UniProtKB/Swiss-Prot annotation:
Keywords assigned: Host cytoplasm, Host-virus interaction, Late protein, Viral attachment to host cell, Viral receptor tropism switching, Viral release from host cell, Viral tail assembly, Viral tail fiber assembly, Virion, Virus entry into host cell
Domain of life: Viruses
Induction details: Expressed alternatively with tail fiber assembly protein U'. The switch from S-U to S'-U' is performed through inversion of a DNA segment called C by the phage invertase protein Cin.
A Gene Ontology term for the protein's cellular component: host cell cytoplasm
Organism of derivation: Escherichia phage P1 (Bacteriophage P1)
Pfam families linked to this entry: Caudo_TAP
Protein name: Tail fiber assembly protein U'
GO-annotated biological processes: symbiont entry into host cell; viral tropism switching; virion attachment to host cell; virus tail fiber assembly
Length: 177
């Protein structure tokens, strides 16, 4: 099975490559050990999965046809077309680690960023939910029921805002009904 690591753009290495670059604006891609991406494609088997992954091991492309992959800035590995490998996708939740496809493990910094994103999403949800009630309150035309809902959502917003996303794990308060 093929495994081409750290593929980057480089200059043409032969006169023929130079002419092709000049004529068709071809970008030449090479592995960290100097192999030409285009020449190596013929060495991949037709009945396997080809996965491109970034420098963190996160899977960014999955194809059966290796020529459909743009591997610039990534590595490409060939894997058997079996259920364990087919379950992966390019959502960012899968990685190639130690020779196998696994669920992604997030760094603490990534987990903190995810928590901060969730916090901002929840605060936007509060703004969306309460916008009409807030206008009704300002105009003095809010019903008692909606005033109660507005209060519950604003208390929820206060709890969300005070949630510390710098220490893991982060637990957010329950949303009002």
């Amino acid at each position: 099975m093929m495994h081409l690591r750290n593929i980057t753009a480089g200059n043409p290495k032969t006169k023929e490559q130079y002419q092709l670059t000049k004529q068709f604006n071809i970008k030449w891609l090479y592995t960290e050990d100097g192999k030409n991406w285009y020449e190596e494609q013929k060495n991949f088997q037709y009945d396997t999965l080809k996965m491109a992954y970034d420098h963190n091991g996160v899977i960014i492309c999955i194809e059966k046809d290796v020529s459909a992959i743009n591997p610039e800035g990534a590595s490409v590995v060939e894997l058997p077309d079996i259920t364990a490998n087919r379950r992966a996708d390019i959502s960012g939740k899968w990685m190639f680690k130690d020779g196998v496809v696994v669920k992604r493990t997030y760094t603490e910094e990534e987990q903190r960023q995810q928590a901060e994103n969730e916090k901002q999403s929840l605060l936007q949800l509060v703004r969306d939910k309460t916008q009409l009630w807030d206008s009704q309150l300002r105009l003095g035309i809010i019903s008692a029921e909606n005033k109660q809902k507005l209060t519950e959502w604003m208390l929820f917003a206060q709890k969300v805002e005070s949630t510390d996303t710098s220490s893991l794990p982060v637990t957010f308060p329950e949303q009002p009904e």
